[in-house]
């Protein structure tokens, strides 16, 4: 049995959705198919709800576009007849529900998180019903078995309950199943929640792990993990194999081919992930598994980058030798739901720098200044501020630990090209070296690192995705 996930671009047009039909129907074994909303629909749902909440009557025009996309898609891909009429009626009922919600928001001029989560869930519900009809699959409502619980003001997966419900739901598995991705429900209240941006990948991985699937396939609009963004490096090609660790590191540092939480559930069960292109189904794609076939072939597998980085530094002579400073930093940030993707600390212990997304920078400074208010007042720690408009670059490869000189070559290359490194970090596992530069230096950094490694004895794979445009 396999699980296949198709993203928004894969179901975003008539041609692509018909390609999905051919790919799914070619599978002989039992298959569970997970789909995202039609490409662009989630953004339209969010925009329409915000317009309605602001009292902008033109929200109705946005809503009409949402209706048109789905009605026309059905007309194009489902032959005229009773099946099409029945499907239009079913979709029409959901769209009418959505219309009523938007009207309510417009009247009260308010949009709660609960209502917003409900609205965005319609994208996957609508698309999955259409694809189920198109492929002859049996539709299952993921809200009934993907369960979340609230932690630190965010909804996170209740793994134990979800696994139990997935196994119960699919104890007798039909040959072809269709499931909406991304959406879930709170285990206590039953309210609609979601798994976050990229959550459809996660839905597929959760199901694959719970059912011990033979494989998980992620179908998207690229040929897998590429050696370079062709907008930056023209000699890009597909990376055939990555380890779970390498793929996770690349994804955590900006490569949006696969949603990072997707990897752990299947890694735990040793289920391979195959990333394929819906628009080029014959392509090899990228296989992600525990061990690659030739682990000695490359010291560096890829470079990934995050271009919206803020660096926050907690510093002061009063930190030296004081136990628990870092604990307080990370506890305060975690309590407020702020994720840290880079940590750099001076050996003298008088400063700790953390990398966060620009959107989290102001809140991070606020909570840290509050946490260390006493030390700041006494002059032991300096007032905490964020340095914004930065970028983080990470080179990744499990075999760096076996290859001396990688860090020297990396920073030597940057120095010779006049690129200043603001902060850097390397884990003890030696699977990645990450560093922070001014965002204006990002493109140059990627190019010179590529040239230095690719044209040398070390074969380089490069990934740089600066602004994710993936669907749910």
Regions found by a protein language model. Give the residues of each.
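Nucleotide/pyrophosphate-binding catalytic subdomain
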Residues: 1-259, 263, 436-438, 457
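A glycine- and small/hydrophobic-rich beta-loop-beta segment
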Residues: 263-265, 270-273, 277-386
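A structural feature that tracks compact, well-ordered secondary-structure segments
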Residues: 315-317, 322-345, 395-398, 404-427, ...
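A generic structural motif
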Residues: 349-358, 393, 430-438
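Charge-rich, low-aromatic oligomerization/scaffolding segments with amphipathic character
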Residues: 360-376, 441-458
């Amino acid at each position: 049995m396999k699980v296949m996930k198709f993203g928004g671009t894969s179901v975003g047009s008539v041609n692509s959705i018909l390609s999905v039909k051919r790919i799914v129907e070619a599978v002989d074994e039992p298959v569970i198919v997970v789909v995202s909303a039609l490409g662009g629909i989630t953004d339209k749902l969010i925009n329409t709800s915000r317009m309605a909440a602001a009292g902008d009557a033109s929200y109705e025009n946005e809503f009409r576009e949402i209706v048109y996309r789905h009605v026309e898609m059905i007309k194009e891909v489902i032959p005229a007849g009773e099946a099409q009429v029945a499907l239009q009626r079913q979709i029409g009922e959901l769209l009418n529900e959505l219309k009523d919600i938007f009207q309510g928001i417009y009247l009260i001029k308010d949009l709660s998180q609960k209502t917003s989560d409900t609205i965005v869930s319609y994208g996957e519900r609508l698309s999955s019903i259409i694809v189920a009809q198109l492929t002859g699959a049996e539709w299952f409502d993921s809200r009934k078995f993907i369960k979340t619980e609230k932690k630190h003001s965010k909804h996170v997966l209740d793994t134990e309950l979800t696994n139990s419900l997935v196994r119960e739901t699919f104890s007798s598995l039909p040959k072809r199943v269709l499931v909406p991705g991304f959406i879930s429900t709170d285990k206590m209240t039953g309210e609609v929640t979601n798994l976050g941006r990229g959550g459809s990948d996660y839905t597929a991985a959760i199901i694959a792990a719970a059912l011990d699937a033979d494989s998980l396939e992620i179908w998207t609009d690229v040929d897998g993990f590429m050696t370079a963004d062709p907008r930056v490096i023209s000699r890009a090609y597909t990376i055939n194999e990555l380890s779970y660790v390498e793929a996770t590191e690349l994804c955590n540092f900006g490569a949006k081919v696969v949603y990072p939480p997707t990897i752990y559930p299947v890694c735990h069960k040793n289920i391979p992930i195959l990333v394929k292109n819906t628009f080029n189904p014959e392509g090899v794609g990228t296989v992600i598994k525990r061990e690659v076939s030739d682990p000695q072939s490359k010291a560096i597998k890829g470079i990934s980058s995050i271009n919206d980085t803020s660096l926050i530094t907690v510093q002061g002579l009063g930190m030296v030798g004081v136990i628990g400073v870092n604990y307080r930093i990370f506890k305060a940030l975690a309590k407020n739901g702020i994720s840290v993707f880079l940590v750099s600390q001076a050996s003298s212990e008088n400063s700790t720098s953390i990398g966060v997304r620009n959107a989290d920078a102001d809140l991070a400074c606020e909570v840290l200044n509050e946490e260390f208010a006493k030390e700041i007042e006494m002059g032991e720690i300096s007032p905490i501020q964020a340095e914004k408009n930065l970028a983080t670059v990470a080179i990744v490869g499990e075999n760096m630990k076996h290859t001396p000189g990688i860090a020297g070559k990396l920073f030597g290359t940057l120095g010779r090209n006049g690129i200043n490194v603001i902060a850097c970090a390397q884990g003890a596992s030696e699977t990645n070296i990450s560093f922070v530069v001014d965002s204006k230096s990002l493109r140059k950094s990627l190019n010179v690192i590529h040239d230095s490694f690719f044209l040398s004895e070390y074969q380089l794979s490069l990934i740089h995705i600066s602004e994710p445009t993936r669907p749910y």
